């Protein structure tokens, strides 16, 4: 599997809606598409007001698998970008849950 970044701008009206979407995403990925896609992590974006978007890191067999997962889980997938390499300078910082 290759690594991809998925940009989901203004995907949800509030953090609660994002939590519901995350549950659907996990279910589809783990139960229906486990051979084709693996969710690694997401960064939640403040989009103004209560709205949130995400930058998600996935491993997948193809961009088409990511699009199919997004469709099945009812998620936006504004842009899918293949990751060429990873440079880790420092580990991700720990942040308090919102």
Name each model-derived stretch.
Residues 2, 52-54:
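Residues at beta-strand starts and edge strands
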Residues 1-41, 45, 63, 68, ...:
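Short S/T/G/P-rich N-terminal loop/turn motif that feeds into the first structured element of a domain
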Residues 45-47, 54-58:
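Amphipathic, hydrophobic secondary-structure cores in small proteins
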Residues 59-89:
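An amphipathic, aromatic/His-enriched active-site/gating alpha helix that lines ligand/cofactor pockets
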Residues 39, 44, 50, 80-83:
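Generic preference for hydrophobic/aromatic residues in regular secondary structure cores
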């Amino acid at each position: 599997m290759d690594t991809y970044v998925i940009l989901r701008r203004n995907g949800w009206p509030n953090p609660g809606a994002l939590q519901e979407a995350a549950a659907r995403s996990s279910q589809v990925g783990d139960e229906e598409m486990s051979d084709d896609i693996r969710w690694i992590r997401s960064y939640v974006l403040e989009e103004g007001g209560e709205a949130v978007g995400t930058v998600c890191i996935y491993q997948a067999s193809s961009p088409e698998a990511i699009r199919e997962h997004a469709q099945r889980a009812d998620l936006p997938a504004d842009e899918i970008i293949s990751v060429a390499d990873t440079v880790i300078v420092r580990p991700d910082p720990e942040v308090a849950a919102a």
